[in-house]
Amino acid sequence: QTTAFAGKTALLCVLHCTCFLSVVYYACYGKMPVRCAGPAMRKRKRTMKIGFDNDKYLAMQSEHIRERIQKFDNKLYLEFGGKLFDDYHASRVLPGFQPDSKLQMLLQLKDQAEIVIVISAEDIVSSKIRGDYGITYDLDVLRLIDAFQGVGLYVGSVCVTKYTAAPEVEAFEKRLNDLGIRTFRHYKIAGYPNDVAHIVSDEGYGRNDYIETERPLVVITAPGPGSGKMATCLSQLYHEYKRGVKAGYAKFETFPIWNIPLKHPVNLAYEAATADLNDVNMIDPFHLEAYGVTTVNYNRDIEIFPVVNAMFELIAGKSPYKSPTDMGVNMAGNCIVDDEVCREASRKEIVRRYFKCLCQQKITGTVHESERYKLELLMNQAGLNVGSRAVEQQAHARSEATGGAPATAIELSDGTVITGKTGPLLGATASALINALKALAGIPQETDLVSAAAIEPIQTLKTNYLGGKNPRLHTDEILIALSSSAATNELAAAALHQLPNLKGCDVHSTVLLSGV
């Protein structure tokens, strides 16, 4: 840990997100048997608040997509936005939503669905990196193919958009073909997206390859934004109508949620998550005019709708939709079962995004001031400030009580806040982690789960033999030490088995955290 960023500018982490407790992150998804630690210990009751009905969502969302398929000629191109396998943002702001809910929903449609992955040739040539995984977009396409096939979903092909001849692109296509994956090419179109007459012609979409598909539901997905998902869908509609198939298009995105208020914290949290893109939630004026009903969409979809609508009219003779909201199929808003739980979770997420922005600004220096200003504005709209969370307040109180040394606070699911200080054996975050496990297992805080005699040789190894400067144990190191102690110490074993109960806890550190 470093104190270079002490004070109010601190890191907020959520354990099932990109988080400093990587070991806890994985442990949370394992099924660990609960071991009794004796009658003298009273374990803290797990009281995670649920605001979203995930089972209802899976059933309602899959059924709604089936209904949309039937509205067309049993052929629907579904533009799939957001993260499919690991939507941790949704799981944080909608407690009860599972990170893989969208994948599970698709699995209910797997006999009808096939996947087409699109990637821009420009991203292949530039070796564009996916920030959350740290891998290039072309490698992420291969990862997605393996992941889809691994759960039984059919991957029909890969489409290279904005195609230009380049050695990197040709090598990528060959690699896919060698793996038995078909590839298709879509080209840059002059005047896109405004010259609608040229786009919807033999010289526009007509130049693109027709992607051969087999199933009623074609899910168009990509490694990241700007890959050309919508353009691919519309190009396919053009070719389908040329072949006499009256196919349809729909858009699946979880956020913003169209049927909750514009300034609902869940929707504000979406703006916070996309502050770098400067997305803005808006009332859909087209929907309001057509139906007299207020719904929420975001600026890019609203701005492009007249163009998309004109394309529909040229392709099909008339547009099936009167508004951007009409194009969507999102049912998440209908599955919120406790609005206040979702509001509170979203408020925390907005502040977390603010701290994340400050951390990135400090670490990389690449964050624009406009992003920070927007996050401050969103906090103000939600009635929040940097001290709105109990963990922030108590982490700084603990730091002040220990002479300004780094401190960490963890809020358990029942609202109890556990703190950890910097000591001679453990860093503040490792200390908070152990203290939280003790609290969950009903173990007195003064109990040593790992003896100093066991920790000191690890410190010697770190500093004398591995070249480390900081002798204090980090989170991963104390968990390994705790695991070793659990073999002979029943209390340590009881604490270890509480790891899954840290899932979703709110954490605040008064300093930036080093990687472990």
For the regions a protein language model found, what residue spans apply to each?
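A short, polar/charged loop-to-alpha-helix boundary motif
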Residues: 425-441
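Flexible phosphate-sensing "switch/lid" loops adjacent to ATP/NTP-binding sites
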Residues: 42-220, 236-398, 405, 412-414, ...
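Hydrophobic positions on the alpha1 helix immediately C-terminal to the Walker A/P-loop
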Residues: 232
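Conserved glycine(s) of the Walker
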Residues: 227-228
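Short HxH-centered metal-ligating active-site micro-motif
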Residues: 439-471
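Cysteine-centered motifs
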Residues: 13, 17-19, 28, 36
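Aromatic (phenylalanine/tyrosine) cluster motif
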Residues: 5, 20, 25-29
